[in-house]
Amino acid sequence: MNRNIIIGFLAALLLASCGYPKKPEAAAPSPQGAGKDNLPLNAQLIGSTPIKNQGKSELCWAYGMLATIESEHIMKGDSVNLSVAYVARMMLQEKALEYYFAQGKKPISMRGMASMLIHYIDKYGAQPYDSYEDPKDVNYKILCRKVEKICDGAIAQKSGIEKLKDELNNLFDKEIGYMPAKQVHMLGAEYTPLEFAHSVCYPEEYVSLTSFTHHPYREYFALEVPDNAMHDQFLNLPLDELMLHVQKAVENGHPVCWEGDISEEGFTHAQDNYVEVQKIELPVTPASRQKEFEQLRTTDDHVMEIIGTFLKDKKRYFVCRNSWGKNWANQGRIYLSEDYLRLKTIAVFMSEAAFLYNQSPKDTPQKPYI
């Protein structure tokens, strides 16, 4: 097999866990970056926690949103590193009960949108990463099938949910890890998981933004993508305004959680970690963006955290921190061009403080918060 074929094969593997089923399951090191640091000196970067690796999971939405929450705290001089494994365990338990009561007619999946993370920690709380670290070798797709098998047995025996919960907890302890203590100890204080979650992210702290022309601007609507299982509402903004909010948020030290399409050639074959759109796709307009979405060429593939921005040759780029480990791209980071964001963004999430910077609250419609 020649070198070009090998590189092409590895690049295809980059369409990792958060892609649709037709895309490969797991991330692999990028042949373009090989973990080398080629970040321009003029890049403005926001503080962030260490790069994590989602492995063979579909949990990019949880990794990306938790990373955004962590960076927002670092910006404030606080330090917090949050557990994805805890959220995954709570989600699996909830979906197992739904599967049981649906008598097996509601398959279990770990896919989701970044906004779902807020719902889960608001309901179940959160744990520090050090208290419940991500297991290195768990395959959540296989784990979902194991959960369904246990539920199928409980359905056949009509055994009830208490016995089912015991069996599930035994499975989760073995596959994900034993649950930490009931109290969270942080900086000399003691919290319940729910109190801890609300201390790092209160329910109304983050806003969800998008830009499409099939709904009125400055109104909220439920995004029509398969992973919006909770029918979350997004504020619809004109494209230029959406991009300005992203740029200003990052320039003022706030992270932004980005959700969008990574199936493009510009992403899978990024040159020196720079992600561009094709020349025939320029200029990117609201109409061309809408056409990509309506013809299903812009799909909800992946979630990353935007932690910086810079100009190169008079073009703006956004530094995205991924969850595919430090050996991918530039030590886990890649640079999306402004045109790529304009064309391939499904939604962005930022703190209310970032959104309202230089904007009067009266200019924004009353929102159904995440």
Give the positions of each predicted feature.
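Positively charged n-region of N-terminal signal peptides that target proteins for export
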Residues: M1-N4
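C-terminal motif of bacterial Sec signal peptides marking the signal peptidase cleavage site
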Residues: L15-S17
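Bacterial signal peptide processing site
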Residues: G19-P21
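N-terminal regions that are enriched for targeting/export leaders
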Residues: K23-I46
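Second-shell loop/turn segments in exported
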Residues: I46-E58, F101-S109, A229-N236, H245-V246, ...
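Papain-like cysteine protease catalytic cores
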Residues: L82-E190
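Active-site signature of cysteine proteases
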Residues: D166-I370
